[in-house]
Regions:
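His/acidic metal-ligating clusters that form di-metal
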Residues: 1-59
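Binuclear metal-dependent phosphoesterase catalytic core
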Residues: 51-155
């Protein structure tokens, strides 16, 4: 980043800011914030949430999973037919989406705009909130834990 003359998009699997951050998130945020003017976006996916936040001048985007949210064995349930669950036993620990999710990022460097065109789906079976999944608060689940990738305009 120090030597880059071009704008940069930082891509990581696990979150650097927001929900479910890596252990040394603050250290990485501090390193990135020094170069905030060069960073268009920092993007990650691991948390399976739909969240956009700013920390110290850097915009961080969480992209949700393409197909499900993991709730674990404690919240195991049947969301599909018995044959599907027999073939894919791990499905009982997920809240799957009815349609695959994806987003399209478009960068317009002349106008200095980045847009994300997302996609919405629905839960197959109960949502994590309906199952009593408790790592996130009810408010956070309502805001960030949805079967969707939101449309966004990032300047």
């Amino acid at each position: 980043l120090k030597e880059s003359k071009e704008p940069v998009i930082v891509i990581s699997h696990q979150p650097i800011a927001g929900i479910y951050t890596i252990d040394n998130a603050v250290e990485i945020q501090n390193l990135l914030s020094v170069h905030a003017s060069k960073i268009i976006l920092a993007i990650n996916g691991h948390a399976h949430v739909d969240q956009l936040i700013q920390v110290a001048g850097v915009t961080y985007l969480h992209l949700t999973s393409a197909s499900y949210y993991w709730v674990g064995e404690k919240h195991a349930h049947l969301s599909m037919d018995a044959d599907t669950h027999a073939n894919y036993p791990s499905l009982t620990s997920t809240c799957p989406y009815a349609a695959v999710l994806f987003g399209i990022l478009t960068l317009d460097r002349k106008q200095g705009k980045l847009t994300l065109t997302g996609r919405k789906s629905s839960w197959i079976g109960p949502s994590p909130l309906e199952l009593g999944y408790s790592i996130l608060s009810k408010e956070e689940q309502g805001l960030y834990l949805q079967p969707q990738i939101s449309d966004r305009a990032i300047a």
